[in-house]
């Protein structure tokens, strides 16, 4: 299995390399990631200037890694079209430092990168974890879950037409009771505009304020707030539950296998 890994936090993000550490146990991993942070870039594609690519020193020996002076979408497009010469079997984006829940997926660079794989008929995963301190403490939990999902895509237990958005609590897997398939919550934030003046001219800051919508019960937000792992299947009708299901035995099996993987260390 050949896996393209990208993100929107930049090529030296700890989340990306925690993910690579686990995915290299599943298949051959190639990293193509932005040369700097590109959060909230959504589906941005660079069309009006050239893209510059540099082969970089990997943080894990033996991994082929490239940095791209562009968006997360640019990275996946470049990886699939130019940098990886053999067919790619899976695109994984993350581990994002910060959750991507509800309608946040529409502006997420993490999800945008995974979308580029899905649009090219490659199964794709976006994986995120909350940031409650300067650095998430349990990146390996998210990495182990992603590795188990990748194994099930490889074996055919999960559809190879999947585009999955996964959000995990920042907890060790032994403290997470369930992985749940969820729909996306609806409106989660509202944007406001703050005005200031620098002595010469006006300037503006866009701010996002989190809402607490009433319809969050059983959604991706509800799951993570209750200490569960949320897995949502994305497609062209993002806010309708698509025909993606996992049996309870399958979700329990993924969690158990990921826990066992984490216990090996």
Swiss-Prot record:
Cofactor note: Binds 1 divalent metal cation per subunit.
Gene3D superfamilies for this protein: Survival protein SurE-like phosphatase/nucleotidase
Organism the protein comes from: Dehalococcoides mccartyi (strain ATCC BAA-2266 / KCTC 15142 / 195) (Dehalococcoides ethenogenes (strain 195))
EC class: hydrolase
Name of the protein in question: 5'-nucleotidase SurE
Subcellular locations according to the entry: Cytoplasm
Stated role: Nucleotidase that shows phosphatase activity on nucleoside 5'-monophosphates.
Keyword Secreted: no
InterPro entries, alphabetized: SurE, SurE-like_Pase/nucleotidase, SurE-like_sf
Record keyword Nucleotide-binding present: yes
Catalysis performed (reactions): a ribonucleoside 5'-phosphate + H2O = a ribonucleoside + phosphate
PANTHER family assigned: 5'-NUCLEOTIDASE SURE, PHOSPHATASE, PUTATIVE (AFU_ORTHOLOGUE AFUA_4G01070)-RELATED
Record Pfam families: SurE (PF01975)
Annotated gene: surE
Cellular component GO terms held in the UniProt record: cytoplasm
Protein family membership: Belongs to the SurE nucleotidase family.
NCBIfam families listed in its UniProt record: PRK00346.1-4, surE
Broad class of where this protein is predominantly found: cytoplasm
One Gene Ontology term of the molecular function aspect: nucleotide binding
Positions with a binding annotation for a divalent metal cation: 8-9, 39, 96
């Amino acid at each position: 299995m050949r896996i393209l890994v990208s993100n929107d936090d930049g090529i030296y993000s700890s989340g990306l390399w925690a993910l690579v550490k686990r995915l290299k146990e599943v298949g051959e991993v190639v990293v193509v990631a932005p040369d700097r942070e590109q959060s909230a870039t959504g589906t941005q594609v660079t069309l009006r200037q050239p893209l510059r690519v540099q082969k970089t020193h990997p943080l894990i020996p033996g991994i082929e890694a490239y940095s791209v002076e562009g968006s997360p979408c640019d990275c996946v497009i470049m990886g699939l079209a130019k940098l990886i010469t053999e067919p790619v079997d899976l695109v994984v984006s993350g581990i994002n430092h910060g959750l991507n829940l509800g309608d946040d997926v529409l502006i997420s660079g993490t999800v945008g990168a995974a979308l580029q794989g899905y649009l090219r008929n490659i199964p794709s995963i976006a994986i995120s974890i909350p940031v409650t301190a300067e650095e998430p403490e349990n990146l390996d939990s998210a990495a182990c879950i992603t590795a188990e999902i990748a194994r099930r895509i490889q074996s055919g237990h999960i559809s190879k037409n999947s585009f999955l958005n996964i959000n995990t609590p920042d907890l060790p897997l032994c403290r997470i009771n369930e992985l749940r398939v969820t729909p996306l919550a609806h409106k989660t934030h509202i944007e406001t505009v703050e005005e200031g003046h620098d002595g010469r001219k006006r300037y503006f800051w866009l701010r996002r304020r989190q809402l607490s919508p009433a319809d969050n019960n059983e959604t991706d937000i509800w799951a993570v707030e209750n200490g569960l792992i949320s897995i949502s299947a994305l497609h062209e009708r993002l806010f309708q539950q698509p025909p993606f299901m996992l049996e309870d035995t399958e979700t329990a099996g993924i969690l158990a296998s990921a826990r066992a993987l984490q216990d090996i260390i």
